[in-house]
Amino acid sequence: MVVGQLVDELILHANRDNTIRHYYDIALVGYSGDEVYSLLGDEIAFHPITMLAEQEVPRIAYTLSHKTINGDTHNILNEVSMWAKPAAQGATPMYKMICSVTNLVEEWCSRSENRDSFPPLVFNITDGEASDAGYDMLRSAAHRLQSIGTTDGKTLFVNIHISSDTNHTPIIFPNLNEVPLAIHHAHLLMDMSSIMPESLHPYIVECRSWFASPPYIAMSYNASMSELVAMLNIGSRSLTIGQ
């Protein structure tokens, strides 16, 4: 559902005068078992947002809870496209996925037409720990991904952990002092994630429930759906900044 929300938001922001403009190239990559695969039914590759907008995708309804500053809760019925189904069973080849995405991003950034573009944003949405590599290998692979970029900056690697565990305080774009280091997976995600650029700090402050000083880490842990929606909107905010 999170993937669907992201794609829907990008299609919405690419709509100008009832026409979908080619503002984004998107790749949807899944990973489970021993496989890393395209969620668009072909080889792993970038596709223009215009192509995704033309596809017919099943939609499901869900309820989004929103708290006001007065403490009141409002439930909003929403719909989202189902571009991907969760694959919580079996292994989680996260290292293999990062390596595949790194090759994809490297090829995209090397094209002359992309050289001066806003750098790629990579969202890793996970509900578990990697099964194919340890801490050092994952961190090294993530840093290699972040080293690739355009003349406008380096690739932003955003890690989103989704969990039903309610024992820990949810965090979104935390600073270094807010990451629960006692939770191994959160510590790993912190070390794998990019530091958010200063140009996006005003939006990050809007997303967070309380103020904290930068630098902000490109990750979330146990965030609510409304927080995830705000976090994923960083992609459309990046478009505005890049124009």
PLM feature spans:
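Acidic, low-complexity intrinsically disordered regions
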Residues: M1-Q243
